[in-house]
Amino acid sequence: MARAVHRSGLVALGIVTALMASCAFAAKDVVVAVGSNFTTLDPYDANDTLSQAVAKSFYQGLFGLDKEMKLKNVLAESYTVSDDGITYTVKLREGIKFQDGTDFNAAAVKANLDRASDPANHLKRYNLYKNIAKTEAIDPTTVKITLKQPFSAFINILAHPATAMISPAALEKYGKEIGFHPVGTGPYELDTWNQTDFVKVKKFAGYWQPGLPKLDSITWRPVADNNTRAAMLQTGEAQFAFPIPYEQAALLEKNKNIELMASPSIMQRYISMNVTQKPFDNPKVREALNYAINRPALVKVAFAGYATPATGVVPPSIAYAQSYKPWPYDPVKARELLKEAGYPNGFSTTLWSSHNHSTAQKVLQFTQQQLAQVGIKAQVTAMDAGQRAAEVEGKGQKESGVRMFYTGWSASTGEADWALSPLFASQNWPPTLFNTAFYSNKQVDDFLAQALKTNDPAEKTSLYKAAQDIIWQESPWIPLVVEKLVSAHSKNLTGFWIMPDTGFSFEDADLQ
């Protein structure tokens, strides 16, 4: 006789089974809320750290930097340098494929470095690679790179996030459109890029490191408003958020489901002054503006204490950084200097910001108020990524509208040259690089060039000090603060953190 089975039992069993399956195979999808939009997914053509950080989803370099900014091997196994400092021979890992099935080998490295070092391609990061004379594929796992002249920081250039290995087949297929079609050796591949809303990446099944990645997808979502970014974390709409609004840090820290992190930074915040334009061509005006800003108050008002007043033009944690006596807040002295410079009643100018998130807005408002106290009327504009690319990065000195410009810089190579040359060398005015002060001093240029020709630490220290002494004295900047990096994440997200250069490390990220 057949046993009777009640329908209600079958239904209950089905529900339990479905729930168990759901738990066992729940997708590990992470949403990361970031402070601004992305300009491109081509690391060689991006000037902003965020775009390059997101590009690490798809791309890897020959070398990289760990969270202490120390050099590590990635797609390379080792390297040697010739005695004259001209030739770098790099041994590559074997058996790695790009996401389109193309082999990663010496020919692929050559294709990327040939593209990067060709000025005809007009890539924004060209200056990193302009010293490459030629790249040769000696055999499938050996690359020889010959420089035009000794460049002691070159291996750090190869570790820069811009030096990504892109599939040569994809480069040939997409050409100048490669920024919309990333194909690398990284742990994730592109799923969707909605240019006004998000970039979503998905697990690359053929990734060469066993057991990785652990996440199924990451959605990078730009959220300009600080409060909205923090709210997304609290409601579970996002699992990681950076930057965290400083004024909300204490509140988030009390949330039992969220972990708040304040980590070291090499992010220097500053205001450059266009020294080729009146009144900023007058050293007394630049000195006056440095006296006009109350940096300790700025730390409290805009950064809620998560920053320190700048004591130089290079963050202290970068090798060869020099520290100086901080600029005191002295509005009386500022007004005296303005009078001596021929501006007893002050002047009107513009103050632009490279970002439009809430913290940048606070810095602009604070600075505007401080300048007003010494008679300077500043019209402020907070730019989005597209405006910055068009109006600041894309225009040369003659057509540039930049006067005062609030921005930040992190030396993503982890060494002093990249903290100084892109921002102060004469050849690095926009659109070449990011010398938005349009500063030029032959002695500084010479000292920076000489420092790259020696591997002697004592000589490098002397040369970098001499350059920084001149820059500090001539004041093309108003150095403001060095940030602390405040991020937060759901406690069930592990292995995801902020690098000192404000990039991200997420290769080992997992959702528990």
Swiss-Prot record:
InterPro entries: Peptide/Ni-bd, SBP_5, SBP_5_CS, SBP_5_dom
Main location: periplasm
Gene Ontology process terms (BP): dipeptide transport
Entry keyword Glycoprotein: no
Record key words, sorted: Periplasm, Signal, Transport
Signal recorded as keyword: yes
GO cellular component entries: ATP-binding cassette (ABC) transporter complex; outer membrane-bounded periplasmic space
Subcellular location: Periplasm
Stretch forming the signal peptide: 1-26
GO molecular function: peptide transmembrane transporter activity
Family, per entry: Belongs to the bacterial solute-binding protein 5 family.
Subunit structure: The complex is composed of two ATP-binding proteins (GsiA), two transmembrane proteins (GsiC and GsiD) and a solute-binding protein (GsiB).
Functional description taken from the UniProt entry: Part of the ABC transporter complex GsiABCD involved in glutathione import. Binds glutathione.
Xref: NCBIfam families: PRK15413.1
Protein name, UniProt field: Glutathione-binding protein GsiB
Lineage per the UniProt record: Bacteria, Pseudomonadati, Pseudomonadota, Gammaproteobacteria, Enterobacterales
Gene symbol of the encoding locus: gsiB
